[in-house]
Amino acid sequence: MSTWYEQAIFYHMYPLGITGAPKTNVQTEVTDRFKELDQWIPHIRSLGCNAIYIGPLFESSSHGYDTRDYKLVDRRLGTNNDFCEFTKLCHENGIKVVVDGVFNHTGREFFAFKDIQEKKWDSPYKDWYKGVNFGWQSPLGDPFGYEAWQGHFELPCLNLYNQQVKDYLFDVIRFWVD
């Protein structure tokens, strides 16, 4: 017996792009753009797709892959409840939803990285990131160096060998599954 995803036909949806959301997240108000995604459901069904791979969704500063809060939907897209309503509508139409969770790096505005910027070696999060070195300055002017995703220093790499990081990320996953 195969699992559902082995038979699934996925439609990839990049919500920030498909809805024309602003490129940078400087707004304070929430804009419900999930309603714009609702209209894509008949099209996705007409293609024979029965699953959507959507994301990134988490609160970020720009393109979505620079997460600043894993437990909030990006305010340029709506609220957590708006996303739940979109997911419910997908399920009512026989479409499963899989979220693109960006769990190997964060943005520079993520709470743990900001804490390191502020407290440096006294930060309890200094081991949450790969290659943190207080004897080196980052190309972006931080008083410490760190490993960055593909050399993009606005995307500091999480230390996935750190148990606290793993616990935190599993907590995030449980938050969204519940």
Question: Where do the protein language model's features map onto the residues?
Answer:
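Substrate-binding/active-site clefts of carbohydrate-active enzymes
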Residues: 3-8, 14-50, 57-178
